[in-house]
Amino acid sequence: MRSVARLRRAYFDCRYGQLHVHQALPPGGGFDEATALLCIPGTHGTGTMFHALLGPVGADRSIYAPDLPGCGQSDAAGQPVGVEQYALALLDLLDSLRQRRVDVLAHGAGADTAIALAKLRPDSLVRRVVLSSPPPGSREAARQLGIECRELPLAGPAEERFTAASVGAQFDDLIEFLGSGKQA
């Protein structure tokens, strides 16, 4: 039987205030865990959409699913924000967590944020990206940066995309794809 992650919520400082982050931490405390997973919602999104994945996928890796600046329970940025600002806020989060490398699960425009994050930290910060409903061109842009890419073709209303039932048939493939990399 697969272990279940400890689910937590926390706040981390970033250049725009505090980010509210939904977390899954492996039962073993994170020692010898697989590469951490950063879940990036689409524009104006929250980490809540990834709740169904936190427990099962977080059994052997830390997972961080933030509410983007100005969204959910994160502080408002105090200025207009877009993809680059979201990427900078996530970079601040990863620096606070001392994460050098992460895998990414990005939904919608979150794919563009993942690509912006990879451009900000080209030293292999992002190893693999799983995309759900990516904007046109995102997959090719990721490949041009040398990022291994896989698409998780979930359909339906946003609130149904990452329910346990909707992920069911593709869950094993997702675990296998993400689970193949231990931290360097």
PLM-predicted stretches and their roles:
Residues 1-37, 58-61, 124-127, 131, ...:
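Alpha/beta-hydrolase fold catalytic core
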Residues 20, 82-84, 112, 126:
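A structural signal for the main folded, soluble domain(s) of proteins
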Residues 23-73:
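Conserved HGGG/HGGXW glycine-rich cap/lid loop of the alpha/beta-hydrolase fold
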Residues 45, 56, 96, 116, ...:
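Active-site catalytic microenvironments for nucleophilic, acid-base chemistry
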Residues 51, 91, 115-119, 172:
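Short, hydrophobic alpha-helix immediately C-terminal to the catalytic nucleophile
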Residues 53-57, 80-83, 122, 146:
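Glycine-rich, phosphate-binding/catalytic loops in enzymes
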Residues 64-105, 109:
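Active-site loop/oxyanion-hole signature of alpha/beta-hydrolase fold enzymes
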Residues 100-139:
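Conserved hydrolase catalytic core segment
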